[in-house]
Amino acid sequence: MITIRDVARQAGVSVATVSRVLNNSTLVSADTREAVMKAVSELDYRPNANAQALATQVSDTIGVVVMDVSDAFFGALVKAVDLVAQQHQKYVLIGNSYHEAEKERHAIEVLIRQRCNALIVHSKALSDDELAQFMDNIPGMVLINRVVPGYAHRCVCLDNLSGARMATRMLLNNGHQRIGYLSSSHGIEDDAMRKAGWMSALKEQDIIPPESWIGAGTPDMPGGEAAMVELLGRNLQLTAVFAYNDNMAAGALTALKDNGIAIPLHLSIIGFDDIPIARYTDPQLTTVRYPIASMAKLATELALQGAAGNIDPRASHCFMPTLVRRHSVATRQNAAAITNSTNQAM
């Protein structure tokens, strides 16, 4: 996909100059205009008309794209965006992508048509190239929980690898070795990084986890319950589980209780995100805190700066997760022996 950067490179000018030509600015010489339009023709570049319309307009709305605003994680993200928006006397428009590339693309385009010149986008389905083209045309577009090469200053991310290592090391430090992983079936980068962190921490202790230690499901409570049942059915004698997120961990707790397995007496479990449900499960869930509210607030400020042309191109924005200790983890050597009936369930 040809971007405005490709046109600038071909014409031997800056991206800003190409933008001025495409927006019919009078601050461009005839020769420069001719060189840019020649490059546009040769590369068959087609600028986004909606994006061009935004270039010279000020909007009182901020757009935000999330997977599903009904999910507590994304609800917290949107609330944080709205808090910053209100401070700037702006309103928030929301688009849901539901984990689908076409809906993700459509949500962004609709918000552009609504004249949102500041966009906070949680994108997992679109390619780097397509996102780069949107970002080339929308200076106020910022990505959250993803980094597109060349646009790190407009991306706010989390170190998922470190968070997963942190969770797994806590279980290892409590005497656990047979540690399963509840994986998201959506196949996104977050899951790949958390799985890699889990494997990395185990390998530090010379433990090579087999594929059978991984149960997959949708990243929600029903998915976590199904993935945990899958692991239990393999009779693996796991003593601990690290879940992709808190929703999956909560679902896993239901499956474990249904099978007579007491948490953390017989099996320990750790989640990821620290959404409100983690404080209200029984037992309360030990988890890795994802500072989504802080990340969303920063992303919104960056989007507003970008829309105003004031963003720092040298900056980077990567957050570190933290461990939240509650009551779903116990030291393995102090754990109660699993009864015959429970052992059969496992």
Curated annotation (Swiss-Prot):
**Record's keyword annotation contains Glycoprotein:** no
**From the UniProt annotation, which stretches of this protein bind DNA?**
4-23
Domain annotation HTH lacI-type: ranges: 1-56
Q: Per its UniProt record, what SUPFAM superfamilies does this chain match?
A: lambda repressor-like DNA-binding domains, Periplasmic binding protein-like I
Kindly state which keywords UniProt assigns to this record, in alphabetical order.
DNA-binding, Repressor, Transcription, Transcription regulation
Per its database record, what is this protein's job? Repressor of the mgl operon. Binds galactose and D-fucose as inducers. GalS binds to an operator DNA sequence within its own coding sequence (corresponding to residues 15 to 20).
Q: What is this protein called?
A: HTH-type transcriptional regulator GalS
Native source species: Escherichia coli (strain K12)
Q: State the encoding gene.
A: galS
